[in-house]
Amino acid sequence: EKIGSGTTVAKEGPFYGKFTRFLVRLDGKLNDPRYAFMFRPKMYAQTAKLKDLLSKILVADGSAQVTILDLSGVPFDIVNTIVSLLARLIFDFNFWNPSRRDFPILLVFEEAHNYLPSSGIGTSAARRTVERIAKEGRKYGVSIMVVSQRPVEVSETILSQCNNYVIMRLTNPLDQNYIKRLVPDSFAGLVDVLPSLRQGEALIVGEAISMPLRVQVDFPKPEPDSSDIKFYEKWK
């Protein structure tokens, strides 16, 4: 736009330029291959019926006992929504399933601090859904397992509903104090050993055992790709 003596200045678009910036961001999402599953979906099941898709996810035909949903390639900003949607669908499936007692489901949430944050960190659709499952799921045959390296960042409502804890090495005082609040008072002193646990060692506390145990987990052979990189051996 030209004003006065011919000086040219940029003119903001509608809504003070916010709409233009929104269109640019939207175009970026549409062309991002990581979002292709949402904007250019493929037919993953033989039909578009929800019950058929759920049957495939839950392997209702009994051909397998474990289903792994790998969300590592999903953009971080929508992982929360996807986890919430999947957890709610599975919970509702067993909620209305008349044979729920013959079809118990365990949902395992890896790296839970990324999408099941404590209430002080922010809102989370996934957290609200999983909190409901933690409180009501047992009646409908749906239980949860929460895995996290930072328990202090995970919803206390969810962790407090857990009956058993497998606690590995923790050196952060905030995490240690958080665990002390979760375990029974008579076992709180055991948390003091957490910083001294070696790799593969864990402290098990809960209703599944008559008394707390300090155990050594056998190392897998061959080691998975997720094992720690031995920096010192590679650099020396």
Regions found by a protein language model. Give the residues of each.
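Conserved P-loop NTPase motor module
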Residues: 200-236
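Helical "lid/switch" subdomain of P-loop NTPase nucleotide-binding domains
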Residues: 126-129, 150-154, 158
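P-loop NTPase motor domains
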Residues: 1-132, 206
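A short helix-turn-beta junction within AAA+ P-loop NTPase domains corresponding to the substrate/partner-engaging
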Residues: 157-169
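Conserved H-loop
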Residues: 110, 142, 149-150, 161
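Conserved nucleotide-binding/hydrolysis micro-motifs of P-loop NTPases
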Residues: 73-75, 113-114, 150-153, 170-175, ...
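Phosphate/diphosphate-binding loops
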Residues: 184-198
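Conserved catalytic network of the ASCE P-loop NTPase/AAA+ motor domain
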Residues: 59-61, 96-101, 134-140, 157-160, ...
